[in-house]
Amino acid sequence: FTPEAFLQLISAFSSMFNARSIVDGLSLMNEESVGKQIAVKNLNISDEGLHPDNVGAFTFDGEGTPTQNINLIISGVLKNLLHSEATARKFGVQPTGHAGLGAKVSVSPDWLVVSNSENEKDKDESLSTTSTLKEYILIDELSAIHSGVKASQGSFSLPFDGWIVNDGKKTSIEAATVAGDILKVLTSIVKIDKEQIVTHQGISPHVWVENMSITGEA
């Protein structure tokens, strides 16, 4: 996955981190999920609304709670959830500054940042896993996010633009679809590049995932 495509996928399943979705029964997670391993050990994901590269940053959320940076996944472990005032009271924690006001108070991330955990043995192991690859598929951009994602079930089937890379030669892919389960994706990551790229929706490196289901033609 390119940084843009991986952020698209994580954002589509941000209900995993959303306490409002958990309360409403629309999340893959529950109250007991915090503290559990849900991804490979070298994956970090945080929400950093105050990051200097986030040009659309707000100091406060819709309820007036100060915006704050919060770790969501550290070394593959779910560490925190995103809260409004109401969900924070229900869970017995402090609001995190992620509420939006509308007909109903919503909760959503501001600026996702994906990185490789440091000092993990499997980081070096994963580098060797992909360094010898002669052919792979690069997913550049996902489409039909709203119709192709079943967030509460964890499944997705999404058209994508991308490339077949063979010995460094890139061939454009036409009319292809990638399908799978988000929790399986998070546990099937074999490499997270060191270099992070700033995009319009957050920051991420390239992320390599094995055993993806892809159909289509070049």
Predicted feature residues:
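Dual-mode signal for accessory low-complexity, basic/Gly-rich regions
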Residues: F17-A19, E32-A218
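Active-site pocket-lining segments that scaffold enzyme catalytic pockets across diverse folds
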Residues: F1-E32
